[in-house]
């Protein structure tokens, strides 16, 4: 059986990749795929490149290729790690997605499906054959709610009993690491994050916030097809600009410490990881997203 590791660009996912690389070097058939949304933090992209560089990983990088016509399935584009932040178009997958489908929102978080799950599945079916591969995902033993049994899916927890603190300690011993705080992980302004984490992200990356706000509110975005307007994406029916303004007068360190006390960075928190099958384990692999 072919093993395909879905690499999210985070520490836990990278630790799974390292474990599977030991198996590949011992003769197992293992492949690695990174699904790029175009909205990751620049330091996440650097981390992905360093994983390839330091561990000599044969990583495949994918971006969804959105067919602009509604009702027509999307494809994918294959890149090399050296193309990250060079030839690969920044934000393009997300921009093309909102042109066709509108913006994702709480209660309609189709972005993981369109940007990651469907193109990943299509690529693997095309290259390995449907039913001929097992997908590995970096979900730990201390995340039991996410460890849902599903044919063809296996987890880091099957290989290691490491919990979040173990992963962090392991990375401190490595020659490189992901150089961003947790609230900037995954897509920087992900709708799955709490408003507090989005508020922190807006303070950390004011320039990126302004750029992304244009991506989700510009005239290119499909609108008028749902109950709420396109800019309403976050919890409490809030917009990105609204969250930025709400926390604009808050002291950064005070807000951060409030979140620490409230355990908003603990295991299972909303920005810890965004795996291709996370919360979507009932997805029909045969479905064509249109």
UniProtKB/Swiss-Prot annotation:
GO terms for molecular function: catalytic activity. SUPFAM superfamilies: Adenine nucleotide alpha hydrolases-like. This is Uncharacterized nin region protein ORF290. It comes from Escherichia phage lambda (Bacteriophage lambda).
